[in-house]
């Protein structure tokens, strides 16, 4: 007999309580949308909904364009993972969980730029120990319907590079465009 996990009853309104341990493990916050699926065996499947994840192919193309245009590494994330990268190591970033620092920037809807080479770059993924490998960085939140749904990030490894207004505006344009695509 296979393990059944946690057993819960459905209340009068059709609600099921997801245990705190599972929510913490899967990083599901209060009010966060979930997709509900059923399979042929009658199982109900809950999946975290990522609005920008639906645009992952489009986001990949957009990241490639950003990278070619700016000459920098371009990343696009949803709230949980890196969904597109161009100009940098895909293995290191793609489908990796975002760092707590980046998650906090998203929560605060904060625009971050490492202005000087002495400024510390925000780690992108949880595995990113950020041993000074990025000398310049712009992080711009993707906002749709007033909520942050991800980020556009430009990175540079070159020691004499500084992100200026042009890079900020490019990241802002990309974030605004992706956010508006989700509102359609």
Label each PLM-derived region with a short phrase.
Residues 14-26:
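Short beta-strand-centered segments at strand-helix junctions
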Residues 92-128:
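Regulatory sensory and allosteric helical modules in signal-transduction proteins
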Residues 136-143:
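A short, aliphatic-rich beta-strand micro-motif
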Residues 56-65, 98-103, 150-184:
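Juxtadomain coupling helices with adjacent low-complexity linkers
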């Amino acid at each position: 007999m296979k393990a059944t996990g946690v057993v819960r009853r459905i209340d009068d309104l059709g609600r099921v309580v997801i245990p705190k341990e599972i929510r913490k493990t899967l990083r599901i916050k209060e009010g966060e949308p979930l997709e509900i699926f059923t399979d042929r065996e009658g199982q109900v499947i809950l999946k975290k909904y990522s609005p920008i994840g639906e645009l992952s192919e489009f986001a990949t193309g957009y990241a490639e364009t950003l990278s070619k245009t700016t000459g920098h590494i371009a990343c696009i994330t949803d709230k949980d993972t890196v969904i597109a990268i161009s100009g940098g190591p895909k293995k290191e970033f793609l489908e990796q969980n975002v760092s707590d620092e980046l998650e906090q920037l998203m929560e605060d809807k904060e625009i971050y730029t490492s202005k000087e080479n002495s400024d510390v770059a925000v780690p992108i993924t949880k595995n990113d120990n950020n041993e000074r490998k990025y000398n310049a960085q712009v992080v711009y939140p993707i906002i749709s319907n007033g909520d942050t749904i991800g980020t556009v990030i430009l990175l540079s490894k070159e020691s004499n590079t500084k992100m200026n207004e042009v890079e900020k505006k490019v990241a802002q344009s990309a974030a605004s465009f992706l956010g508006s695509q989700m509102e359609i």
